[in-house]
Amino acid sequence: MNIRPLHDRVIVKRLEEETKSAGGIVLTGSAAEKSTRGEVVAVGNGRILESGDVRALEVKAGDTVLFGSYVEKVEKIEGQEYLIMREDNILGIVG
């Protein structure tokens, strides 16, 4: 992928969600919720503070992250769906 997000934006590839319930039932269509877990594929240079300084982002390419269900932008790049969000939308880094 040949794209670099600006400022505090992060590009995330959504990871596939389990399609089976805890009881072993296969979920299809609207019953299977979209995953709120993904892999960071690119990050911007950081957030520009009021002082003009740049605060580096805490996430980096390769991190597995949890994010809120609202995503700023969904974009197809080279046939693959990516999520473009601000670092503030990321709730945590997994493991």
Curated annotation (Swiss-Prot):
Q: Which UniProt keywords apply?
A: Chaperone, Cytoplasm
Pfam families, per database record: Cpn10
UniProt-annotated location(s): Cytoplasm
What are this entry's molecular-function GO terms? Answer: ATP binding; metal ion binding; protein folding chaperone; protein-folding chaperone binding; unfolded protein binding
For this entry, list what GO says about its biological process: chaperone cofactor-dependent protein refolding
- GO terms under cellular component: cytoplasm
Could you name the domain of life of the organism this protein comes from? Bacteria
Q: How does it assemble?
A: Heptamer of 7 subunits arranged in a ring. Interacts with the chaperonin GroEL.
Q: What does this protein do?
A: Together with the chaperonin GroEL, plays an essential role in assisting protein folding. The GroEL-GroES system forms a nano-cage that allows encapsulation of the non-native substrate proteins and provides a physical environment optimized to promote and accelerate protein folding. GroES binds to the apical surface of the GroEL ring, thereby capping the opening of the GroEL channel.
Question: Its family?
Answer: Belongs to the GroES chaperonin family.
UniProt xrefs under NCBIfam families = PRK00364.1-1, PRK00364.1-2, PRK00364.2-2, PRK00364.2-4
Name used for this protein in its record: Co-chaperonin GroES
Organism field? Pseudoalteromonas translucida (strain TAC 125)
